[in-house]
Regions:
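RNA-interacting cores
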Residues: 1-250
């Protein structure tokens, strides 16, 4: 089971909180966990937490979205985040005014959700800086191949029992995807001593696929708001929301 939590933060007046502070929030979170849990997370190649920080114009609020991508981390982290009242960062304490907890979902539920759509158009909105690594270099445009590879890798990490490993099916899926519209801007995500080339904005993808492959693609899209897209989703990058047709993911 995976789960999404959203913490509404209230920075003190005059304090600007950049999106890169997501990395500091993650450091605070790791410090709150039992030592054995934190050590286990650091040893894993793909961390079971994807999170990001963004300002919501609709809600006029700063929101920290935290996705817990396996049952062990969900049981450890969810009670901690639902009870926190303030996050004491060195730069400034951040009061938590609200915590919204989405129901936990399974891979089977996401797959069923994918089957409930016959629309072939989806919009992905990248709320925090997103990037890919290709041939050892940063790629700052969401090509269809890179989108699919990223979503599949994150899915396989979260749901190894439902791993997508059929190369022929994935190739057919890739060949049926087409970015038909985009509204993107380049940016940089400061991380330690590096400023990672990245992008934010939105893309619209059309899928010309046989029904079984369209269901698979829609399941991956429904997972995107949890697993994120691209690299360093554990450090605040790649925060994504998605709408399929006129309806969003669960």
């Amino acid at each position: 089971m995976i789960q999404q939590l959203q913490l509404v933060l209230a920075p003190p007046t005059g304090v600007r909180v950049p999106q890169a502070w997501a990395y500091r929030l993650y450091g605070w979170l790791m410090a709150q966990l039992p030592a054995d849990v934190g050590d286990a997370l650091h040893l894993q190649g793909e961390h079971p937490i994807a999170h990001f920080l963004h300002f919501s114009p609709e809600k006029q609020a700063l929101i920290w979205t935290v996705n817990l991508l396996n049952e062990t981390v969900r049981q450890s982290v969810s009670p901690l985040l639902t009870s926190v009242k303030e996050i004491p960062l060195h730069e400034s304490p951040l009061p938590v005014t609200e915590v919204h907890v989405s129901p936990a979902v399974s891979a089977a539920e996401l797959i069923r959700f994918g089957r409930s759509f016959d629309e072939n158009r989806a919009k992905l909105v990248f709320l925090s800086p997103c990037a890919f690594k290709q041939s050892g270099r940063y790629a700052i445009f969401p090509q269809e191949t890179l989108l699919l590879q990223s979503l599949t890798a994150h899915w396989n990490t979260a749901f190894p029992e439902y791993a997508l490993t059929d190369d022929d099916a994935l190739l057919a899926l890739q060949q049926g995807l087409h970015i038909v519209d985009y509204n993107l801007r380049t940016t940089r995500y400061p991380l330690k001593e590096t400023r990672i080339p990245s992008f934010q904005g939105s893309v619209t993808v059309e899928a010309h696929l046989a029904p079984p492959l369209l269901e698979l693609w829609n399941a991956l899209l429904s997972f995107a708001p949890y697993g994120g897209v691209g690299i360093k989703t554990t450090l605040g990058m790649g925060g994504t929301v998605c709408s399929i047709g006129r309806t969003g993911a669960p």
